[in-house]
């Protein structure tokens, strides 16, 4: 499939996602644990089953409040995450 990238992360409690942005729209679903995500200055805690959407070119950051499992979908695809 083309047009998007699917990524799976196992994140340890206390891990920090530094503030950044990218040209890709991003949807993130927490499947286990609690993750604090700040999108464009607005902070929310996400738990299992909850989904956050980060618009393209929007500054965001985060922190794992517990050990977490997170699935991300990026569109357009991120070639730097390719297995090719």
PLM regions and their residue ranges:
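Ligand-binding loop in jelly-roll beta-barrel domains
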Residues: 56-80
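A short glycine-rich, His/Asp/Glu-containing loop-to-beta-strand
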Residues: 1-18, 73
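Short acidic-glycine-tyrosine-enriched beta hairpin
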Residues: 41-56
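A cytosolic small-molecule/anion-sensing beta-strand core signal
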Residues: 31-32, 47-48, 66
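Short histidine-centered beta-strand/loop micro-motifs
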Residues: 8-9, 17-22, 63, 83
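Short, conserved beta-strand element in jelly-roll/cupin
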Residues: 10-11, 22-37
